[in-house]
Amino acid sequence: MKIYLVGGAVRDALLGLPVKDKDWVVVGATPQEMLDAGYQQVGRDFPVFLHPQTHEEYALARTERKSGSGYTGFTCYAAPDVTLEADLQRRDLTINALARDDDGQIIDPYHGRRDLEARLLRHVSPAFGEDPLRVLRVARFAARYAHLSFRIADETLTLMREMTAAGELEHLTPERVWKETENALTTRNPQVYFQVLRDCGALRVLFPEIDALFGVPAPAKWHPEIDTGVHTLMTLSMAAMLSPQLDVRFATLCHDVGKGLTPKNLWPRHHGHGPVGVKLVEQLCQRLRVPNDLRDLAKLVAAYHDLIHTFPILQPKTIVKLFDAIDAWRKPQRVEQIALTSEADVRGRTGFEASDYPQGRWLREAWQVAQAVPTKEVVEAGFKGIEIREELTKRRIAAVANWKEKRCPNPAS
């Protein structure tokens, strides 16, 4: 029995990055030998075991053979005669097909170290094309390592395009698509994930609402980048700089989806793209089974981001109505989230990356003023039932009006 550290732990150690999870491959052992050694079996489809002390995963060396469609259509063979090289060959990328033995020696049969040094994401073998999930995984790795200047090998991108054209991605379940997307959105450069999907044709299949934005013009005065799809990815990039929150990043991605369905004869203007966008966000989230809290914020951002940009001319009554609409009284975090997405929208434009966004500050300040109005005083004043809500709203509007006059006067007055 020989045990090797494999995959991401070896890759990240060679890159000088923190190693989070360790995966191990066991060569020359049977399931019974693993159980006798105190390991606990957890894999149903193939033999994976948990170490009795560290609880890290130890998998018996195995090979995989395509036996059906999609990413689940594989037959696994695990036995003591499966070599380490054979196990590594079934992996997606050469940089993930690395192993390290007890002496610290690197086993690299598919030239993963060479590709690490060249900053290349290259598939190990033609078997890559048998698993459509790998298209998303490569896009995610491209996003994860974009700051290290990694790029996808030409032949790998070609294979990804062929897989997409062959309809392989249609076999992916919504849950798997969302899981990869969720992980990609938390990387330093989430926009790269969507750009790679676009480059290989997968964006049109998996995110048609986003893909439809490319080629849609916007007024050059406000959007020097002109293309709404380009702006969307620039905005997502800015959101990633402003916030680590998945909610904020996803909502930013979806903020302009309505522009893909506005009347073409009115382009480059997109009147009413907010309400249209809300419906498309609902459609996208339902299809991919996006969690409700992410969906709800994305719908609010699609509906109200343009309103935030006009904050200096908003009436106090409109501002308080906005807080009602986003349910800020029960979910105060939404004020900050919407401020960040709106800022990302403004700064995610060519030449505006370093712009100040005072509207975000004013939104936060107005919220502090409105929510500081005490409900207790309204109740003590004798108001009852629905009167409490009406009086509270009236007092909040008055408080915001007083603040706005001093802090954020209407430019027209």
Curated annotation (Swiss-Prot):
A GO biological process of this protein is: tRNA 3'-terminal CCA addition
What InterPro entries does UniProt report for this protein, alphabetically?
CCA_bact, HD/PDEase_dom, HD_domain, NT_sf, PolA_pol_head_dom, PolyA_RNA-bd, tRNA_CCA-adding_enzyme
Cofactors = Mg(2+); Ni(2+)
Keyword list, A-Z? ATP-binding, Hydrolase, Magnesium, Metal-binding, Multifunctional enzyme, Nickel, Nucleotide-binding, Nucleotidyltransferase, RNA repair, RNA-binding, Transferase, tRNA processing
Molecular functions per Gene Ontology: ATP binding; CCA tRNA nucleotidyltransferase activity; cyclic-nucleotide phosphodiesterase activity; magnesium ion binding; phosphatase activity; tRNA binding
Instruction: Provide the residue positions that the database annotates as binding Mg(2+).
Output: 21, 23
Residues binding ATP: 8, 11, 91, 137, 140
Q: Which residues form the HD domain?
A: 228-329
SUPFAM superfamilies assigned: Nucleotidyltransferase, Poly A polymerase C-terminal region-like
Could you tell me what the cofactor note in this record states?
Magnesium is required for nucleotidyltransferase activity. Nickel for phosphatase activity.
Any extra detail in the entry?
A single active site specifically recognizes both ATP and CTP and is responsible for their addition.
Q: Relay the domain remarks.
A: Comprises two domains: an N-terminal domain containing the nucleotidyltransferase activity and a C-terminal HD domain associated with both phosphodiesterase and phosphatase activities.
Which purpose does this protein serve, as stated in its record? Catalyzes the addition and repair of the essential 3'-terminal CCA sequence in tRNAs without using a nucleic acid template. Adds these three nucleotides in the order of C, C, and A to the tRNA nucleotide-73, using CTP and ATP as substrates and producing inorganic pyrophosphate. tRNA 3'-terminal CCA addition is required both for tRNA processing and repair. Also involved in tRNA surveillance by mediating tandem CCA addition to generate a CCACCA at the 3' terminus of unstable tRNAs. While stable tRNAs receive only 3'-terminal CCA, unstable tRNAs are marked with CCACCA and rapidly degraded.
Subunit arrangement? Monomer. Can also form homodimers and oligomers.
Q: What is this protein called?
A: Multifunctional CCA protein
Q: Which organism is it from?
A: Salmonella typhi
